[in-house]
Amino acid sequence: MPMHFLLRYELSPDYLARRGEHRDAHLSLAWAAADREELVLGGVVGDPVEEALLLFRTREAAEAFAAADPYVTSGIVTGWRILPWRTVVGEDAAEPVRPA
């Protein structure tokens, strides 16, 4: 069954204070994944920031991204998990479903 995969990041309480040191490397990794059409969207959630979500086309791409992400390896991401997401509405839906 076609799906997208959400990479969900739990962030350290001092995420905003610490991210600057690793931000360029993180964004380079993210844009490279987007250029390969693996990463659809990504960013932080909340104001103030609560967590981050990144939407991938495959579980493997999400796993590889998390393993290489400087935010993860530096510890400012304190936990992560990948959630399968059966997208059914929108131009980029993995499995578009229209009303009968």
Task: Name each model feature, range by range.
Residues 1-100:
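Conserved, structured core segments of small domains
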